[in-house]
UniProtKB/Swiss-Prot annotation:
It comes from the Bacteria. Monomer. Belongs to the IF-3 family. Gene3D superfamilies: Translation initiation factor 3 (IF-3), C-terminal domain (3.30.110.10), Translation initiation factor 3 (IF-3), N-terminal domain (3.10.20.80). InterPro entries: T_IF-3_C_sf, T_IF-3_N_sf, Translation_initiation_fac3_CS, Translation_initiation_fac_3, Translation_initiation_fac_3_C, Translation_initiation_fac_3_N. IF-3 binds to the 30S ribosomal subunit and shifts the equilibrium between 70S ribosomes and their 50S and 30S subunits in favor of the free subunits, thus enhancing the availability of 30S subunits on which protein synthesis initiation begins. This is Translation initiation factor IF-3. It is found in: Cytoplasm. One of its GO terms (cellular component) is membrane.
Amino acid sequence: MQKRPNPRGNPNQDKFAHIRINEQITNVASIRLVSDEGSDIVTLDEALRRAKEANLDLVEVSGDQDVHVCKLIDFGKYKFELLKKTKEAKKKQHVVTVKEIKIRPRIDNHDFEIKKRHALEFLQKGDKVKVTLRFRGREMVHSEIGMNIVNRFVEDLKEHASPEKMPVHDGKTIVVVMNPIGEKPKG
């Protein structure tokens, strides 16, 4: 039974298709050959001959200049090193996400402190925090109470975060987004 081809293609197939090696390098009269001994300008045939003698591959490093730059290296090792570098770069990336903290106008002090502690944890990880205060029913009559709570939240976290803009009263909600300041993400 024959295996169906993956409709998205092989993920590892085309990563190195843009790199020209050995006989794939064409339409070039002379190249700058970089090797362990140094670099010099030689013809393409001479570079291919040297690559065969050294049992290495001729890999085009830069082809966008007047003189193409090629290296004498083992292409398998070169591919491995490139994959290793991309994996390391991917590991070091930190995607900033927006975490939301929902509070109410009649929040108890203990609950307020817990919500604040959660927001602080998110900020220390390098994430943004969106604080949303939602009014229900007649609570809208005393919207200044809600604004005071959100302002207190912002004030308590001012050492760790700065608001993108001042709290916005939008219908039945008050929203403020806070960015972490000065701290590197942990983990």
